[in-house]
């Protein structure tokens, strides 16, 4: 995973790229193949990275999202615990497992997985953020690489106080054919109540490699004018909606569809 920022002397220009066919397909709810500009990495400088070397999660960089190391919390249809996030062979592995007696016999039977973030160690405003990953295979599994800050819950703003930036989300394994090989990129602002506002930026097919078997790269270029989303270095979508003007931290997570620790009906 690499995080970069613009050198101070660079002010990238945002150009508008429109494709009528792509717009029609998006409105129909079908994923589209990324077709925009290629990512220009020459305008960035590396500021942070984790190659997941070694044999355990680096806790100087990562902590549990909404929980501390060793704790267990309910997250939608499962439980989150850091023990399900392990490191080996130069990769982070977030497992999803069923424990009939609960994790370590804690009396909470159910599915367990994990979500980790950099909230205590690193945050950044503007730049390029990416992860290279294989998506989890399973109906009801929902992996994501996203950004967040405390201002997301604040109301009466247009994103400048903070936004949930979903660089990629992968809830589509259950779909048949090529539609299942897709991810979504979304923006959320103004909390999650009645004043919540959201923008679905793109629903993209992943075509270079099978996303459930091979690595692909999912990236975000974020600047003062907007967000540009990339898959394998090719633009998938862009928006000026809800541009955050504050530093945000990164999250890597897997969730099980459902609520209160119970999977949704039909999940298997």
Label each residue range with its predicted role.
Residues 30-268:
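GH16 jelly-roll
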Residues 1-2, 23:
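Accessible peptide chain termini
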Residues 3-16:
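Bacterial N-terminal signal peptides that target proteins for export
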């Amino acid at each position: 995973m690499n995080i970069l920022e613009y050198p101070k002397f660079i002010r990238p220009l945002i150009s508008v790229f429109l494709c009528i066919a792509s717009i029609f397909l998006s409105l129909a709810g079908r994923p589209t193949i990324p077709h925009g500009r290629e990512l220009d990495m020459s305008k960035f400088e590396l500021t942070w990275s984790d190659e997941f070397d070694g044999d355990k999660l680096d806790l100087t960089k990562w902590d549990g999202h909404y929980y501390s190391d060793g704790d267990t919390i309910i997250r939608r249809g499962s439980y989150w615990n850091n023990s399900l996030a392990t490191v080996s062979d130069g990769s982070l592995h977030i497992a999803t497992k069923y424990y009939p007696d609960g994790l370590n016999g804690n009396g909470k039977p159910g599915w367990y997985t994990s979500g980790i973030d950099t909230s205590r160690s690193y945050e950044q405003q503007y730049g390029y953020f990416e992860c290279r990953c294989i998506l989890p295979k399973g109906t009801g599994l929902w992996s994501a690489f996203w950004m967040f800050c405390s201002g997301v819950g604040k109301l009466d703003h247009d994103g400048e106080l903070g936004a949930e930036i979903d660089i990629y989300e992968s809830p589509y394994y259950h779909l048949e054919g090529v539609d299942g090989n897709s991810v979504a990129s979304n923006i959320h602002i103004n909390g999650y109540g009645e004043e919540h506002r959201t923008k679905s930026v793109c629903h993209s097919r992943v075509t270079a490699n099978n996303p459930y078997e091979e690595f692909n790269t999912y990236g975000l270029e974020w600047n003062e004018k907007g967000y540009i989303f990339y898959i394998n270095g090719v633009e998938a979508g862009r928006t000026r909606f809800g541009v955050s003007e504050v530093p945000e931290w990164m999250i890597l997570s897997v969730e099980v569809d459902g609520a209160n620790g119970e999977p949704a009906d039909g999940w298997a």
